[in-house]
Amino acid sequence: MQAEAIFTGTEMLLGQIVNTNAAFLGRELAAAGISLYRQVVVGDNLVRIREAIDNARRRADLIIVSGGLGPTEDDLSREALAAALGLPLVEDPAARENVTRYFAARRRPMTPNNLKQALLPAGARAMDNPHGTAAGVFLEHEGKVYALLPGPPREFEPMLVNQLLPRLEPYGARREIIFSRVLKIAGIGESGVEEAVKDLLHSDNPTLAPLAKPGEVTLRLTARAKSQEAARSLTALLEITIRERLGDYIFGTDDDTLESVTGAILAARHLTLAVAESCTGGLLAHRVTNIPGSSDYFLGGMVTYSNEAKVKFLGVEPEVLAARGAVSPEVAAAMARGVRQAVGTDIGIGITGIAGPGGGSEEKPVGLVYLGIDFRGQVEVRRELFMGQRENIKWQSTQSALYLLWRSLRAQCE
């Protein structure tokens, strides 16, 4: 069953509210095995809502409209559906009962315009709405299924789950199980990931969808099958192929983060960590300590923002700072070594860079970051050049530092 969704409301187009119904609808239809191919947002205009319905019914088997079922003049979804299908609006006893019951239960007077909510296109059935005055609308017409649902999420969500989805079972909704698995990737950009899996992106079942985030790329593998085991098997086969190509960059799955994965390895191997930060201002330590149980492996951190602090607390040589500058591979290495020795850990990480917006030069532009890691005396330095605002550069710096830690742990512990 192929579906399209139309969300009505000028306030969404103006950015005054966020359309959370779209995400909820997508998840629920996917779980029910219904393919949602298109979502559109339309303002509170009769002509445009009708046009959206006309366009959708030429392509889809199921057309869902959210919003526009209230009592005011700009609530136009019932009128638009009736006009699109050439049907009259008639009063529905069940819809009228929904309105009157709502006001009676709250001992509030009902104004006459509320009875507009009892009007349905001829042949439609009302869907009960215990959370509001507007009944939903369910209509089969000329081989298509139409559903009108209220816009407020507290009404939309229960009506979708409790009223609409059960009604769709006789109309060919697939009862397949949908299983998704997410692969988490770092250390390589979105273009590099897509190049590695471009021949797999057109797979129909399972599907493969990349998504880029700052310092990370995710690959979502989604399979449909008659059972959970069969769906898992399909994604597992695809995952094997992807890992053969990108295994050096896949650090986790599903809800894993770099800080949770590296933390688990540190704890399992009884290794300890300390960090020295300059441009990130403590963000790396913050992320590491967000993980429950991090006190088992994280012993401490320092924010050495000034050159004087780097010399005093980390033992960075003044001559190195004078000759190479604070943002240099030599200083990153010295920071990692200094914090490891000062705190007494197995591993030390040092971060130094230019987060901006000022402070950059042609030789050392904004976004230049050096990351150092000292693993029991073995030092490695990584150079990065990030783009974006100050907060984004700081985040990507910590992401790269955690990836460097993950990679070092893999190399040392294999």
From Swiss-Prot:
Q: Name the source's superkingdom.
A: Bacteria
Any Pfam family from its record, for instance, is CinA
Query: What CDD domains does the annotation carry?
Result: cinA (cd00885)
Concerning Gene3D superfamilies, the annotation shows: 3.30.70.2860, CinA-like, MoaB/Mog-like domain
**Which PANTHER family did the record assign?**
NICOTINAMIDE-NUCLEOTIDE AMIDOHYDROLASE PNCC, NMN AMIDOHYDROLASE-LIKE PROTEIN YFAY
What family is reported? Belongs to the CinA family.
Could you identify this protein by its name? Answer: Putative competence-damage inducible protein
Species, as recorded: Moorella thermoacetica (strain ATCC 39073 / JCM 9320)
Q: Give me the gene this protein comes from.
A: cinA
